[in-house]
């Protein structure tokens, strides 16, 4: 086996490891239970996502935006981006982008159809 063939195999192996590491890094940005230090970023821009709210006795307070008034649980301002109560985040370079698959009003429309 020539030097360049061996080098090619090594590079393919490294590329595979890099892609696995990238997948592991994406799992760090979980939408189910984000890290406390990530909440400021997510909740600033995604005020409708469940993990941004602390609810008790039917009223919810935003965990990060302390000056935001409490809202009634399950009301429109508090509802989640997706009908399955999750938001999907896509890392696009240094920018995190939120993709909400189905807005609450669309979900209600489908349920009433």
Swiss-Prot record:
Keywords: Early protein, Signal. Induction: Expressed in the early phase of the viral replicative cycle. The keyword Signal applies. InterPro entries: ASFV_fam_110. The keyword Signal applies. It holds the Pfam family v110. Disulfide bonds: none annotated. Residues 1-31 form the signal peptide. Plays a role in virus cell tropism, and may be required for efficient virus replication in macrophages. Belongs to the asfivirus MGF 110 family. This is Protein MGF 110-2L. It comes from African swine fever virus (isolate Pig/Kenya/KEN-50/1950) (ASFV).
């Amino acid at each position: 086996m020539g030097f360049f063939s061996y080098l090619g195999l090594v590079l393919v192996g490294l590329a595979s490891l890099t892609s696995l590491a990238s997948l592991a890094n994406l799992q760090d940005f979980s939408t189910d239970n984000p890290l406390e230090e990530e909440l400021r970023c997510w909740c600033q821009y995604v005020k409708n996502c469940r993990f941004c709210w602390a609810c008790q006795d039917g009223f919810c307070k935003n965990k990060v935006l302390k000056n935001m008034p409490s809202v009634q649980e399950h009301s429109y301002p508090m509802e989640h981006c997706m009908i399955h109560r999750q938001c999907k985040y896509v890392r696009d370079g240094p920018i995190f982008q939120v993709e909400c698959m189905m807005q609450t009003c669309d979900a209600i429309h489908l349920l009433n159809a």
